[in-house]
Amino acid sequence: MNTPKPIPTPLTVTGLNVHESVGHAIVRALKRHGVECTFGQSLPTMFQLSAEAGGVKQIVYRTENAGGYMADAYARLTGKPGIVTAQNGPAAALLVAPLAEALKASIPVIALVQDVSRLQTDKNAFQDLDHIGMFSAVSKWVRRVNEPSR
């Protein structure tokens, strides 16, 4: 029987300290690449809180499909990748159309999507969908960050 690996605490993850989350690491990575703003709502929570603290402006959308098109427009107008964030499940599904448009038009849009806990994946958890499968047809590259050290 496979037992899941223990989830590391921030103190055991390289590059994070006790006061930081994976959201902080993502914000630092985006800042290194010149990202100044993202389009999102309140989720993924730790990313949104970290973005504000890290100086990444958050532009709020009403629905995820609108957020995807906002990120697309931003990329077209600035020449920089547009970043959109979304909650998992049905909310994430609303990103399919704008991501398909961006892919076919060769517009750089990055979607950061919350997911259920690793321990709840494939167990019919609330709003658990196969995001990898859903986004593979409308994205150049899709990955899941399974542990903070990634």
Predicted regions and their residues:
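N-terminal alpha/beta PP-like core and its mobile active-site loop of ThDP/TPP-dependent enzymes
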Residues: 2-150
